[in-house]
Amino acid sequence: MRVAKIGVIALFLLMAIGGIGGVMLAGYSFILRAG
């Protein structure tokens, strides 16, 4: 599951750079459901 972990890290980095809290929460909840 290393590929998935890298994808999650990439998403978090993009979200952090964007600074969009709503997207971060939505992405985090999606990751929890997908995982």
Swiss-Prot record:
What residue ranges are annotated as transmembrane? 6-26
Q: List the disulfide bonds.
A: none
**Where does it sit, as one GO cellular component term?**
plasma membrane
- Keyword Metal-binding among UniProt keywords: no
Indicate where this protein resides in the cell. Answer: Cell inner membrane
**What protein family is recorded?**
Belongs to the UPF0387 family.
Name under which the protein is recorded: UPF0387 membrane protein YohO
Q: Which organism is it from?
A: Salmonella typhimurium (strain LT2 / SGSC1412 / ATCC 700720)
